[in-house]
Regions:
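N-terminal chloroplast transit peptides
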Residues: 2-7
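N-terminal Rossmann-like NAD(P)+-binding subdomain of aldehyde/semialdehyde dehydrogenases
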Residues: 28, 33, 37-188, 221-222, ...
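Short loop-to-beta-strand entry elements in the cores of soluble alpha/beta enzymes
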Residues: 76, 84, 226-237, 307-326, ...
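C-terminal core of ALDH-fold dehydrogenases
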Residues: 82, 463-571
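Conserved NAD(P)+-binding/catalytic subdomain of aldehyde/semialdehyde dehydrogenases
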Residues: 202, 236, 251-362, 533-534, ...
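PLP-dependent aminotransferase-like
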Residues: 202, 214-266
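NAD(P)-dependent aldehyde/semialdehyde dehydrogenase
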Residues: 326-327, 346, 352, 360-481, ...
Length: 607
């Protein structure tokens, strides 16, 4: 692995010097539209009801989708794949425009520029193209099969990342596995999630408000994989992205498989209550789920809710990051502290995968050094403007509850989002982990990080892992994703204990030596709450998205990253080439090739 990284460093170094640091290979270029607003509708502003889809029009839309639902369900996998690839091409064309609109609303910060939004949007062609690959393989009669399958205890593990030869070069040192539910058998069913034929039904997707890419994956699953005619209701918070999604999904809209509508609570109520809607998918909060499923009635474990249609949901989480005590060097401490800060800063911390609880060993001899580095990293980062409605109120509640918390960060100097208030990074003082602690059970949805300690004997890694497992499983609210960082020497000395930790931790996605943020951006991994939540205690939700191999019976995903990445990760606030890097990522996912890989490697080493 080290020799491979070294070879790429040498190659990229030569390439970066070529033409004074500018790579000019026409086959690397991606043709994009200039930053402009989609002609389908004028640009929308949050809270502007002028463009809300009228309720009577919603009824017509559902009727139209329902009338063609059976025909769409019978659409061949080959045709679905073709449409998916067309949508992926459209996503590249609108990339500059949707990025420009995103930073106009959310803000553009000196150290990342527009690269954060562009790199997030690159997930769109990634998930669409990868879904197309699976559908094409199934159409040919050969299920697209992952890189390898092996057993770990009662679990079958399926290696789904990296898969292609190019991905192996680019992501050397990373390993992503789907963990199937115990008892599911030694052979996974590739394509088991794909539905073709049947009577067809209409699905309502209530889109996320924080990231424009989230409904893309929802649509890919419901329309392309499950074969549902779908109406996507844009969240009022990011309805500005709707016209760009309309253009991206124009092939599916023309095929009669998708419509995009606008509005707020009234729109959601009308759609979910429509008699010809067969199922619902939500990305949002548990409160939204409860409002739909329980309809204002008290939640009960011994009785079904009044809403009887199937509802899948990807909801929130108080995301824990566990730092396993070990012989971390100063440079390693600094790098891992930066990883934590990056996930808190990303998207103004309005992410269900943002680090919210940092779990350390109270007696770790490097604890104070880590906390010092963490403060330094926060203080070097610009504060973000709190664009999401209600986020500032949540933040203020934490300020009131923890008067000794530290407020850190550089003043915001963003372009755009001037009307929104910048929020300092709020670091809650260290204390013991507790299931009654606000820092562990209340999702802040703002730049808040709780420091929580486990009082285990110094040097007893097994005791720490057991305590950490208990803490994340029983004291932290939600089960969507988590991360754990462990020094290679520590893992080697405690291999069995760490494997048991990964087996027993009840989260839908687990990052090992990498933020769970990256788990989200690998479309072949699953994304969703850990199985087992009930309608009366939904927490992080039910059902999963992504999983572009369409393998059924998935319990969770585990993504391992290298302890010391050879280049600065693209999500890092310390990346010095974010603008070029994000566009190279987009180009690679739009058209994986040696040329686009070269461009990406050059951009990466310049970061």
């Amino acid at each position: 692995m080290c020799r491979l990284h070294g070879a790429w460093r040498q190659f990229a170094g030569r390439a970066s010097r070529w033409r004074q640091g500018v790579v000019s290979l026409t086959r690397l270029e991606v043709v994009v539209d200039p930053p402009r607003h989609c002609a389908l509708q004028p640009r929308r502003k949050v809270g502007d009801t002028a463009y809300n889809t009228p309720v009577d029009e919603l009824d017509k839309i559902v009727e139209q989708l329902h009338s063609g639902a059976a025909q769409w369900a019978a659409t061949s996998l080959q045709d679905r794949a073709r449409l998916a690839r067309q949508c992926a091409q459209n996503a590249v064309k609108v990339a500059e425009a949707i990025t420009a609109d995103a930073i106009a609303y959310k803000g553009c910060y000196d150290y990342v520029g527009d690269g954060e939004e562009m790199s997030a949007w690159s997930f769109t062609p990634s998930v669409l193209n990868d879904t197309a690959r699976t559908l094409e393989a199934l159409h040919s009669g050969k299920a697209r099969f992952p890189s390898g399958v092996h057993k770990q205890g009662a679990h079958t593990l399926v290696r789904v990342f990296p898969t292609s030869a190019l991905d192996h070069l680019l992501f050397s040192g990373y390993e992503g596995d789907l963990w199937l539910t115990p008892g599911s058998g030694p052979t996974p069913t590739a394509g088991g999630e794909v539905v073709v034929g049947g009577p067809g039904e209409v699905c309502v997707v209530l889109g996320a408000g924080n990231q424009a890419v989230v409904p893309v994956a929802d649509v890919a699953l419901k329309v392309l994989v499950h074969g549902c005619a779908t109406v996507l209701a844009m969240n009022p918070v990011n309805e500005w992205a709707g016209p760009h999604l309309e253009r991206t999904f124009e092939p599916l809209i023309k095929a009669g498989a998708l419509r995009i509508v606008y509005g707020g609570i009234a729109t959601g109520k009308a759609l979910t209550a429509h008699p010809k809607v067969g199922c619902v998918h939500i990305t949002g909060s548990d409160k939204t789920y409860d409002a739909i499923v329980w309809q204002g009635q008290p939640k009960r474990a011994d009785a079904p809710p009044p809403y009887t249609k199937p509802v899948s949901a990807e909801l929130g989480c108080v995301t824990p990051y566990v730092m396993v005590p070990g012989p971390w060097s100063d440079a390693e401490i600094d790098a891992k502290a930066a990883e934590v800060v990056a996930t808190v800063a990303h998207n103004a911390s309005c992410n269900c995968l943002a680090a919210k609880v940092l779990i350390l060993g109270r007696n770790w001899d490097r604890k104070d050094a880590f906390l010092k580095a963490l403060r330094q990293q926060f203080n070097s980062a610009q504060q973000r403007r709190c664009y999401y409605p209600g986020s500032a109120n949540k933040y203020d509640a934490f300020v009131a509850a923890f008067p000794d918390a530290e407020a850190l960060g550089q003043p915001a100097t963003s372009q755009g989002a001037d009307s929104f208030r910048p929020l300092p990074y709020l670091v809650l003082p260290p204390q013991a982990v507790s299931s009654t602690d606000k820092g562990c059970v209340d999702e802040a949805w703002s730049p808040v990080l709780a420091i929580r300690e486990l009082d285990t004997p110094a040097g007893d890694t097994s005791a720490f892992l057991n305590a950490a497992k208990e803490a994340v499983n029983t004291s932290c609210w939600g089960t969507l994703s988590c991360s754990v960082f462990i020094h290679p020497a520590t893992e080697a000395q405690n291999k069995a204990a760490f494997q048991q930790y990964l087996t027993d931790v009840r989260y839908g996605a687990i990052g090992v030596n990498t933020p769970s943020l990256f788990c989200f951006f690998v479309p072949s991994l699953s994304w969703g709450g850990y199985p087992g939540h009930t309608q009366d205690d939904i927490q992080s939700g039910v059902g999963q998205v992504h999983n572009t191999f369409c393998i059924d019976k998935v319990e969770k995903s585990v993504l391992r990253g290298p302890w010391s990445p050879p280049v600065t990760p693209f999500w890092s606030i310390r990346h010095g080439n974010m603008r070029q890097m994000s566009r190279a990522i987009l180009a690679y996912f739009a058209n994986p090739s040696l040329w686009s890989l070269t461009r990406l490697v050059v951009a990466a080493v310049q970061g």
